[in-house]
Amino acid sequence: MKKIFLAIIAFLPLSLMAQELKLAYVNANEVIMQMSETQDMQKQITDLQTMYEGEYMKLLEEGQKKMKEFEELQKTNADQAILQSRAEEIRNLEQRIEMFRTNSQEQLQKKQEELLKPIQEKVSRTINEIGIEKGFTYIFPVEVLLFKSSSAVDLTAELKKRLVK
């Protein structure tokens, strides 16, 4: 059994060398940035960001108003219990503002990932189709290439032709 395993391992490199490797690379990010779906996604993200910024500004204005009222109240030598109550309101509002800021950033990130996923899947499917149609052994993302030989084929233009309208 051990001899059979060693024989298979010994001849494996020869069988791999006998196959012609057809290599290609693609700049999928460049194509994604030019797709109409990506531009639609960016508009949705910008609209959502604008909405969140509007809400955030309202909260900040409310905080500034409460702070100003508190400062005015301090000048009148108001009862200590009232001052403590207002100070607590301001602290709670500051916490709400910080939570809103954090949550809105997370929601924005989540929405962007949600909208980008089908675009990336479409690009991946199209790259697979091109690879099968043209008989490529491997297709690499251009970002990971340290070296490319003259025999490697750039499929970016083909991918653009199929996806960018």
Predicted regions and their residues:
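Amphipathic, charged alpha-helical segments and their helix-to-coil junctions
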Residues: 19-165
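Sec-dependent N-terminal signal peptides
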Residues: 4-14
